[in-house]
């Protein structure tokens, strides 16, 4: 883009920000909180419901498989918690680059760029997914090398082949979600996710209980449940649901792929280090004594923690959208206030859930298993589960702020240091050397999360939001394609 165009864009955004700032300054604190909370919940509520529904697909599958036997449950847990989370972390992290780009572009009124960014992200993520496929094909040797029991691995490698289809479903799923969230149009995602969850419950019962197809029935239903919402999202995006931001397939999608790839890689590094953290917890537990019971109990705890995490991840998405929109529109005060509102709201919910799960203890485990030994182990781990829920109510929101501002590269180093140089070594010492077993491993890893949360809090408090606005403008002006140049379209909408 020419220098004059960049200066004009910056001037317009500065004027918009000044006008918006004057209007907001006239409002009282309660009004500001109310207005920002509404904007936050417009994104957060559908995002939370969607994540609950998506996570519910895995929970329902696990509940049905858990009644087949402890070996099947352990195999499913290790496949989804280790292998699928490995690729999920990479792909979701890489897709978060789209969240930064679309959010800031939408705030800057560069609506035509959202569709181009979406198509670039499809290209980058599809290539990455193809590269990840051998992990599932050779899952047996990989899991054995990681020290897992052979009888569990025999079942896990069958499940892993089914998961290849699920892995490819993440490409349209994550990218369309980021694209729609940036425009606060993610209600459609919640609707189709609800339908998909209902279909999954029915298919799971039909194939596993009525026809007794076992693992095959469970994975068939799971695969359908993951792909059904994607088809609906793609139709919504490309068939008129986003006329202002989707202008048809464009040859400009093949331009500037390398910068998008680099931003996607830094985004992937940030989030995958985070998601892999729990996978390593499962791997370390699999090498402890009585691994079958320990794995089952930990899988149940992590699923409960994961359900609460869906709330925090909803606020991660909302914080990212709000911060990126405000930065793109040139409003540093708005970005800062959006951050404070998101953190406070998520933390308040986290405190309530902290006390709820302290009270429930092991009672909830009977949803997933009939084993008394596993239920007793879950009850023993429940205080750690409650503290994990409390800390996870803040940390993902701060990560969302980082995504909205484009700090993924910095947070990657923070995650690497706090999780892998602090949390895991302490967990290994407490679990294996001190002999605290699962508790010791989890305590160490919770300490890593605590340190990471403290570092992100300091980073956020010390942020110069005016400087972040300037950085956002430079990024947008560097990659923007003027609407008049976007003529090489395969198709377009009137």
Swiss-Prot record:
Residue numbers bearing the N-acetylalanine modification: 2
GO MF term set: antiporter activity; xenobiotic transmembrane transporter activity
UniProt keyword terms in alphabetical order: Acetylation, Membrane, Transmembrane, Transmembrane helix, Transport
Residues that span the membrane, as ranges: 40-60, 73-95, 123-143, 158-178, 188-208, 217-237, 268-288, 297-317, 340-360, 384-404, 416-436, 441-461
Membrane topology: Multi-pass membrane protein
Cellular-component GO terms for this entry: membrane; nucleus
Pfam family, one: MatE
One example of a Gene Ontology biological process annotation: xenobiotic detoxification by transmembrane export across the plasma membrane
Predominant location: membrane
InterPro entries assigned to the protein according to its UniProt record, in alphabetical order: MATE_euk (IPR045069), MATE_fam (IPR002528)
PANTHER family for the chain: MULTIDRUG RESISTANCE PROTEIN (PTHR11206)
Family membership noted in the UniProt record: Belongs to the multi antimicrobial extrusion (MATE) (TC 2.A.66.1) family.
UniProt-recorded name of the protein: Protein DETOXIFICATION 21
């Amino acid at each position: 883009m020419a220098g004059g165009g960049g200066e004009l864009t910056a001037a317009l955004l500065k004027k918009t920000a000044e006008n918006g700032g004057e209007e907001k300054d006239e409002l009282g604190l309660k009004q500001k909180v109310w207005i920002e909370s509404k904007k936050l919940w417009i994104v957060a509520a559908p995002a939370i419901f969607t994540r609950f529904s998506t996570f519910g697909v895995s929970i329902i599958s696990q509940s049905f498989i858990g009644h087949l036997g402890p070996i099947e449950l352990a195999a499913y847990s290790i496949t989804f918690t280790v292998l699928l989370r490995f690729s999920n972390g990479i792909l979701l992290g890489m897709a978060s680059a789209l969240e930064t780009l679309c959010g800031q572009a939408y705030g800057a009124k560069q609506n035509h760029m959202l569709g181009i960014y979406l198509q670039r992200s499809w290209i980058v993520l599809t290539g990455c997914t193809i590269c990840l496929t051998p992990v599932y094909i050779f899952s047996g040797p990989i899991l054995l090398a990681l020290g897992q029991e052979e009888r569990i691995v025999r079942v896990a490698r069958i499940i892993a082949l089914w998961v290849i289809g699920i892995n490819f479903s993440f490409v349209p799923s994550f990218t369309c979600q980021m694209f729609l969230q940036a425009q606060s149009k993610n209600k459609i995602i919640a609707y189709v996710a609800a339908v998909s969850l209902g279909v999954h419950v029915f298919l799971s019962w039909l194939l596993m209980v009525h026809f007794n197809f076992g693992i095959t029935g469970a994975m068939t239903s799971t695969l359908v449940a993951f792909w059904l919402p994607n088809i609906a999202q793609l139709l919504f995006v490309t068939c008129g649901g986003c006329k202002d931001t989707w202008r048809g397939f464009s040859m400009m999608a093949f331009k500037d792929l390398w910068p998008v790839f680099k931003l996607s890689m830094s985004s992937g590094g940030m989030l995958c280090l985070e998601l892999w953290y729990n996978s390593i917890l499962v791997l370390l537990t699999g090498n402890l004594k009585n691994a079958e019971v320990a794995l089952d109990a930990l899988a149940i705890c992590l699923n409960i923690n994961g359900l609460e995490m869906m709330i925090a991840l909803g606020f991660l998405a909302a914080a990212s959208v709000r911060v990126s929109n405000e930065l793109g529109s040139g409003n540093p005060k708005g970005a800062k206030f959006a951050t404070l509102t998101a953190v406070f709201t998520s933390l308040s919910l986290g405190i309530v859930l902290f006390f709820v799960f302290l009270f429930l203890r092991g009672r909830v485990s009977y949803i997933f298993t009939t084993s008394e030994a596993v239920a007793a182990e879950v009850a023993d781990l429940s205080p750690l589960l409650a503290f994990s829920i409390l800390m996870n109510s803040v940390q993902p929101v701060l990560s969302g702020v980082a995504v909205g501002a484009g700090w993924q590269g910095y947070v990657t180093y923070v995650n690497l240091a706090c999780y892998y140089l602090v949390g895991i070594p302490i967990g290994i010492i407490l679990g294996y050397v001190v002999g605290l077993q699962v508790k010791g491993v989890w305590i160490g890893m919770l300490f890593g999360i605590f340190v990471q949360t403290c570092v992100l809090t300091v980073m956020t408090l010390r942020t110069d939001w005016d400087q972040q606005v300037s950085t956002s403008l430079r990024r947008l002006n560097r990659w923007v394609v003027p609407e008049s140049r976007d003529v090489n379209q395969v198709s377009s909408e009137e």
